[in-house]
Structures are given as structure tokens and as C-alpha cells.
Swiss-Prot record:
GO terms for molecular function: glycine hydroxymethyltransferase activity; pyridoxal phosphate binding. PROSITE patterns: SHMT. Keywords: Amino-acid biosynthesis, Cytoplasm, One-carbon metabolism, Pyridoxal phosphate, Transferase. Its cofactor is pyridoxal 5'-phosphate. The record marks 287 as: Plays an important role in substrate specificity. Its main location: cytoplasm. One of its GO terms (biological process) is tetrahydrofolate interconversion. Its EC number is 2.1.2.1. HAMAP family: SHMT. This is Serine hydroxymethyltransferase. Catalyzes the reversible interconversion of serine and glycine with tetrahydrofolate (THF) serving as the one-carbon carrier. This reaction serves as the major source of one-carbon groups required for the biosynthesis of purines, thymidylate, methionine, and other important biomolecules. Also exhibits THF-independent aldolase activity toward beta-hydroxyamino acids, producing glycine and aldehydes, via a retro-aldol mechanism. Pathway: One-carbon metabolism; tetrahydrofolate interconversion; Amino-acid biosynthesis; glycine biosynthesis; glycine from L-serine: step 1/1.
């Protein structure tokens, strides 16, 4: 399938036409394809797919090729349990250097006193923070009162008393249905099982945080941890007020800025809206508005540094040195002036998109946004969030359904959509494109209708969009994305030619594989055998699988998307 794509590229380009980023990308794929061609093909297909959809998922973005390259090296081979210069393994001097550099970059970027860059995910970071707080606030004072310095010195009876004490503390975070995250105390998550959770909610009428009500609840409950942050709240947070509340009740203020870390780093949220300034501990992911690798980190005041650095063995095992290297690169990138421009553009685009949605007659939770996301109520369209999500994906727009406050449709079907601007802003889109996207969303949702199940009842999960609407919207999506190319350094036709041809025996796909492309049975123009010579409208195919009845499907008009190669179906599947 592949006889050194890198060699082919270098042999056909003049020196001034060679792009170093593409060379690095090709070299990586060449190595992968030599061992496992399908994986290289799937990586290229993911690039094709991401270039084919307008990405409005608020928790996703596009990392730089430099960030990606920092992860593809031998650092992945190294165990480095512990923290810099205090490891459980020898020979970690280079990992010490990398982790220390990443932590220093994070501190400089956010103005933090201490940074811990080992967590693999936001959930991991929150667990480390929770246990660091429990350790410093509950465990260490208890050990001191017993005249010992470590839990290993306790008797079985003493340890059980301490364990029960640590497991009976209160966590007060934003309710899941008000926009809080699963890890903020949701009962189906470990956080809801390791604490006595006393969640606060947004105001039922305004959808906004009511700081007076939160203070009254905190005084009544007196939690160990007051947690501020969100995954689906479209407004900014006053962290100064949260800190004042925490101080009044003796709580530790923890902030989860996973969604808006890039807005903090870029100077969009400053003063009272800066969680790092006011919180004792701050957790975050690196891959959302911060545009880094998939991972997380923790920032904290000096008094919590020792407890946080014990994330291993408290919660984590070995860190991922190659990802910590990529985090360092991302933090350095975010310290550039260009990132500040980007961060402000993210919010400007979110506000422009919100205004345009309202002008299109759509209803937004809280009437707008202060950050990178907005919540759209789809009930006026007669749809559930799940139906709306599927209808838009079928038309080339990716986003996710989301519960609204006090949502009657629950957490699975939902009544809303969460829409974010980080990724489209990374592509260079601006307010005018946001207006166009709002029109596309309105057109799709206005045309979508629930489908009927086999029993004749209306489905709450599936919806269909008329073919002419889908075709029109997909055409606009293609035109829009053609002007804002993801990773323009990467030559897609070249990658297709060298990596996406399916080897014999692996060129079948199932009907459900077409769902992401918005293809329905009505799109089938004709079905012919692999050896059949057809008319000029459908080019013949020469590939097939040995011993299998394979048919090729020709699409009348591939709705949006990366269906530029024939799609194969086994006879049984078709």
C-alpha cells in the first residue's frame, strides 16, 4: 500500500516547496503504516473527517502540529512515578527537566504559585485535587493530633476512624443539570460517592448563578470544598465572591476551569473573573480553549503544593512524559501575543453566534453568553437534544446535545444543544461566519422532523431532514470549510493517495458506518457488483475481497462529506 510516502514527497518537490511540518507528519505516518497500514489510514481519515465538518463542540479544539509532534517520541517509554527530583525510578533526569519546564510555563502563563502537570484528564485532575484537599485539611491534622506523621503508622482502629472521617466530608459544586460537570458530585460519578454532595443550582427563572443563595446554602451546609466551575454554563463567574463565601464558612475554594482556561490565559477573564487569583486550587484540561494535548494540570497556592505533588501515589501512577512535553509546548504557545488575540476572538465569535441565533428566532439559555459556549433550547422546534444533534451532524455540523437547567428530558435525550466557538475560531472564522452558521443551524432544525419507530410512535432519538435541505446545507458547509482549511500544511490529496487505500480483505463497511456522513438508504443511486462495468455516471471499481460477495454503493450526491472513494458492503450487510 505504501512505499515510503516521505520519499515520494521529497523526490517530487523543489527544496523551496518542502514544508517541514508535512515532512514530519509523513515520516510519522510512514513508520506507522509499515507496521499497521490500517492505523495510518484511519489517522488520515480522521484528518479528512475533521476537514469535512464544522466543529462546534465546545470541549474540542485543534492543537498545533508542534504540540502533536512533541508526543510522538521515546519519552513514552519512560516511567517517572513521583515528581521532579523525587522519583521512585532512576534515570529520570530528562523527564525532570521536561516536567519542571512545563510547570514553570504554566505558572508563568497563569500567574500561579505552583503547578502540577501530571494528570491525564480533567477527571484525574479533579480527583487529585479532592484528595489533596482531604489530605491537607483532614488527614494531616488528624495524624498530628495522634502524634504520627504518616497514615502507615496508625493502628487498624485509628486508620478506620480517619478513613470514615475523610469519607464523610461535604462537597458543594454546581449541579449537573445546571451546567456542572460529572466530577462535581454527580451520583453516577465517583465524586458523588466519595463525598456528601450538597449541590447548588442556577436560578430557575434567570438560569444564572445566585450568589446570595449560594452563600446562604454554604452557611447552612458548611462544606469542606466549595467548587466553582462548569461544563455547560454560558456566563462568567465572579470568583472573588466565591472566595468570600468560602472564607466565611471555612471552605477550600476549588475552581474547575477546564472549559475556559484559554480565556484565562488569554486575558479575557481577569480581575474578579480570574479563578487562579482567588482560588486555593484550580484544575483544568489542556485540550479545550487552551489548544494543547489531551491532558490536564493543577494550579494551587503554596500551602497546597506538597499535597498536590503527591498525586502519585494518591491517585495517579506513572505520568505520561511525552504528553507533559506537549503540555510545555502548548503553554509556551499560549504565552504568545497571538494567543491573546485568539482568546478574545473566541468570546467575540460566541457572542456573535449567540446574537445571530437570537435573530434567527432561536432561544438561548440566559439569553446569550459571556464565554466560549451557548446553550440552545430546541424544544420550540419539537425536537429533543438528541434528535437535533443527529440532524445537524447529518448536515455536516458537529456539536453535542446537553441538558438544560431542570430539563424534563433528562441527561440522555436532553432539551438543548451546547455550541462552542473554540475550534472554528482556530480555523480563522469570524463574526460573519458565525452569522452564516446560525442560519444553517436554524435551517436544519426548522426542517427536521421526528421519525416514526417500527411501532408507529414518534421517536425521541431520531429525526430526519429533507434531502433538499440537507444537500443545500452540506453544500454551504463544504464551501465554508474550503475557505478555512484545517492544517493547511498537510496535503490531503497526497495523503489520500498514499495512505487511504484499503488493503484486500479490509474494504468492507457496514450501514451504520455511514451514519456520521448523513447517508440514508434514499441516497443509494445503484448497487452493482465489484466487477460490473457501469455507466459513466458511476465509475467502475476494480477492488474487491477474495471469496466475499462484495457490492459497491454509488451515492446520488454524497451529502457533505468525505465520501470521495467508493464504499463497500458485503452482500449480507446490504
Amino acid at each position: 500500500m505504501n512505499n515510503s510516502a516521505l520519499r515520494a514527497y521529497l523526490s517530487t518537490r523543489a527544496p523551496d516547496q518542502i514544508h517541514s511540518a508535512f515532512v514530519a507528519y509523513l515520516a510519522n505516518l510512514d513508520l506507522v503504516a509499515h507496521q499497521f497500514p490500517q492505523i495510518a489510514s484511519d489517522i488520515v481519515q480522521e484528518l479528512i473527517d475533521q476537514r469535512s465538518y464544522v466543529k462546534l463542540i465546545a470541549s474540542e479544539n485543534y492543537s498545533s502540529l508542534a504540540v502533536q509532534a512533541a508526543m510522538a517520541n521515546l519519552l513514552t517509554d519512560k516511567y517517572a512515578e513521583g515528581f521532579p527530583h523525587h522519583r521512585y525510578y532512576g534515570g529520570c533526569q530528562n523527564v525532570d527537566s521536561i516536567e519542571s519546564a512545563a510547570a514553570a510555563e504554566a505558572c508563568a502563563l497563569f500567574g500561579a504559585e505552583h503547578a502540577y502537570v501530571q494528570p491525564h484528564s480533567g477527571a484525574d485532575a479533579n480527583l487529585v485535587a479532592f484528595w489533596a484537599i482531604l489530605s491537607r485539611q483532614i488527614e494531616m491534622p488528624t495524624l498530628s493530633s495522634l502524634g504520627v506523621t504518616a497514615a502507615t503508622h496508625l493502628s487498624e482502629e485509628q486508620w478506620e476512624v480517619l478513613r470514615q472521617k475523610m469519607g464523610n466530608q461535604k462537597l458543594m459544586g454546581l449541579d449537573y443539570f445546571s451546567g456542572g460537570h460529572l466530577t462535581h458530585g454527580y451520583r453516577q460519578n465517583v465524586s458523588g460517592r466519595m463525598f456528601r454532595v450538597v449541590s447548588y443550582a442556577v436560578d430557575r427563572d434567570t438560569g444564572l448563578l445566585d450568589y446570595a443563595a449560594i452563600e446562604a446554602q454554604a452557611k447552612r451546609e458548611r462544606p469542606l470544598i466549595l467548587l466553582a466551575g462548569y461544563s455547560a454554563y454560558p456566563r462568567s463567574i465572579n470568583f472573588r465572591i466565591f472566595r468570600e463565601i468560602a472564607d466565611k464558612v471555612g471552605a477550600v475554594l476549588m475552581a474547575d476551569m477546564a472549559h475556559f482556561a484559554g480565556l484565562v490565559a488569554g486575558g479575557v477573564f481577569t480581575g474578579d473573573e480570574d479563578p487562579v487569583r482567588w482560588s486555593h486550587i484550580v484544575t483544568s484540561t489542556t485540550h479545550k480553549t487552551l489548544r494543547g494535548p489531551r491532558g490536564a494540570f493543577i494550579l494551587c497556592k503554596k500551602e497546597f503544593a506538597e499535597a498536590v505533588d503527591k498525586g502519585c501515589p494518591l491517585v495517579l501512577g506513572g505520568p505520561l512524559p511525552h504528553v507533559m512535553a506537549a503540555k510545555a509546548v502548548a503553554f509556551r504557545e499560549a504565552r504568545n501575543a497571538a494567543f491573546k488575540t485568539y482568546a478574545h476572538a473566541v468570546r467575540d465569535n460566541a457572542r456573535a453566534l449567540a446574537d445571530a441565533c437570537i435573530q434567527q428566532g432561536m432561544q438561548l439559555q440566559t439569553g446569550g453568553t459571556d464565554n466560549h459556549l451557548l446553550l440552545l433550547d430546541v424544544r420550540p422546534f419539537g425536537l429533543t437534544g438528541r434528535q437535533a444533534e443527529r440532524a445537524l451532524i447529518d448536515c455536516g455540523v458537529t456539536l453535542n446535545r446537553n441538558s438544560l437547567p431542570f430539563d424534563p428530558n433528562g441527561a440522555w435525550l436532553t432539551s438543548g444543544l451546547r455550541i462552542g466557538t473554540p475550534a472554528v475560531t482556530s480555523l480563522g472564522m469570524g463574526p460573519e461566519e458565525m452569522k452564516r452558521i446560525a442560519r444553517l443551524i436554524a435551517r436544519v432544525l426548522g426542517a427536521a422532523t421526528p421519525v416514526r419507530t417500527k411501532t408507529g410512535a414518534l421517536s425521541k432519538s431520531a429525526a430526519e431532514v429533507p434531502g433538499e435541505v440537507r444537500s443545500s446545507v452540506c453544500s454551504e458547509v463544504r464551501e465554508l470549510l474550503a475557505r478555512f482549511t484545517l492544517y493547511p500544511e498537510l496535503d490531503e490529496p497526497f495523503l489520500r493517495a498514499h495512505f487511504t487505500r484499503r488493503p484486500a480483505g479490509q474494504n468492507t463497511c457496514r450501514r451504520r458506518d455511514l451514519n456520521p456522513y448523513g447517508v440514508t438508504p434514499t441516497d443509494f443511486e445503484s448497487v452493482v457488483s465489484a466487477s460490473f462495468t457501469t455507466s459513466a455516471r458511476a465509475q467502475p471499481i476494480t477492488r474487491g475481497t477474495k471469496g466475499t460477495a462484495v457490492h459497491v454503493v454509488f451515492l446520488r450526491e454524497a451529502p457533505c462529506l468525505p465520501l470521495r472513494e467508493p464504499l463497500f458492503f458485503s452482500h449480507e450487510e446490504f
